[in-house]
């Protein structure tokens, strides 16, 4: 019943809502977060309060938390805040043993912190009728007709807060694929770049605020790099290509997970020409199903149900 819910849109510039947020953080029995929130560092939870980290992805190719290479450049005050926030995560929801190990290293947690119930955000992909509906809906919006849809969704890079530069040669992609494909461009909401000039009969720029789970059902081929999208898209078992043009630089500055090249379920390219050749020759990995099974081990379409059961148990114990 939404009438029983109090939606507070948090904004650093909205003092009233900020105070409201802090009130709820200090009075709630169960707190769900899906990212790093510095506000947690300012809260001292009472006994019995459980903060559960849902996270915003069911897998990781880039390092984060204490594993992030840039952590060495942060101040002692920053590190103290990180520690305070991470220590509030009493449970972390995971969809696989692999992701559990990453969380343990990234947040300095142990096995008892892991809630192996599957990732709730993946439940939607198991609703076949809904996915078919979304596929038809978005293909109609794209005017795809008899064409296949390629989605290019690069990961966010820290320097793109000021200005981003797209390395992909879109003219070459159009010459190679415009007869049989459409190229859909989906950038991170924080990226600042003018892409209106890229809108053509071949290239479609999707609003940055459109949720990815809305689009994936309509996608036939995914192109990305270090994003977590492949872990969800792999549930469809459709081809994935990795346009990792700055792999060495990114690994040095931010950090990729160990054995990145062996883990990903598709070929790597560092130039648009290589990428085009890979797509044309269909040199996709044969391990998509194994990759999905491994990283979505506990995600079976019922993770949200198990999450609700767990939360109800916590609330009952609080009575």
Task: Label each PLM-derived region with a short phrase.
Residues 29, 87-92, 182-183, 218-221, ...:
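Short active-site oxyanion
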Residues 1-129:
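Active-site and donor-binding regions of nucleotide-sugar-utilizing enzymes
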Residues 35, 95-98, 189, 226, ...:
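Helix N-cap/beta->alpha junction signal
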Residues 198, 228-295:
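Catalytic binding pocket for nucleotide-activated donors in carbohydrate/polymer assembly enzymes
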Residues 106, 114-197, 269, 303-305:
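Conserved catalytic-core segment of nucleotide-activated headgroup transferases in glycan assembly
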Residues 130, 272-319:
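C-terminal amphipathic helix plus adjacent low-complexity
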Residues 15-28, 189-231:
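Donor nucleotide-activated moiety binding/catalytic core segment of transferases
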Residues 31-45, 50-55, 209-254:
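A donor-sugar binding/catalytic signature common to diverse glycosyltransferases
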């Amino acid at each position: 019943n939404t009438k029983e819910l109090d939606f507070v849109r948090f904004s650093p510039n909205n003092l009233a809502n900020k105070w409201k947020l802090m009130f709820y953080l200090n009075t709630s029995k169960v707190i769900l977060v899906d990212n790093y929130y510095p506000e947690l560092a300012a809260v001292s939870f009472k006994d019995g309060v459980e903060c559960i980290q849902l996270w915003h992805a069911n897998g990781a190719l880039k390092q984060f938390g204490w594993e992030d290479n840039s952590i060495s450049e942060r101040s002692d005050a920053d590190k103290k805040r990180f520690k305070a926030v991470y220590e509030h995560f009493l449970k972390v929801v995971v969809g696989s043993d692999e992701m559990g190990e990453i969380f343990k290293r990234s947040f300095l947690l142990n096995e008892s912190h892991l809630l192996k119930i599957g990732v709730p955000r993946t439940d939607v992909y198991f609703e076949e009728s809904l996915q078919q509906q979304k596929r038809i809906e978005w293909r109609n919006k794209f005017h795809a007709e008899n064409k296949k849809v390629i989605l290019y969704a690069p990961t966010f890079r820290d320097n793109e807060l000021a200005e981003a530069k797209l390395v992909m040669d879109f003219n070459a992609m159009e010459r190679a694929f415009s007869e049989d494909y459409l190229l859909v461009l989906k950038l991170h909401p924080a990226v600042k770049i003018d892409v209106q000039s890229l809108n053509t009969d071949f290239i479609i720029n999707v609003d940055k605020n459109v949720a990815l789970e809305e689009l994936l059902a309509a996608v036939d081929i995914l192109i990305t790099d270090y994003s977590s999208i492949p872990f969800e898209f792999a549930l469809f078992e459709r081809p994935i290509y990795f346009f990792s043009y700055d792999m060495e630089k990114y690994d040095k500055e931010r950090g990729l997970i160990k054995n990145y090249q062996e883990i990903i379920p598709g070929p790597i390219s560092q130039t648009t020409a290589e990428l085009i050749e890979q797509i044309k020759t269909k040199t996709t990995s044969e391990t998509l199903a194994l990759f999905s099974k491994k990283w979505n081990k506990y995600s079976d379409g019922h993770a949200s149900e198990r999450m609700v059961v767990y939360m109800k148990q916590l609330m009952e114990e609080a009575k």
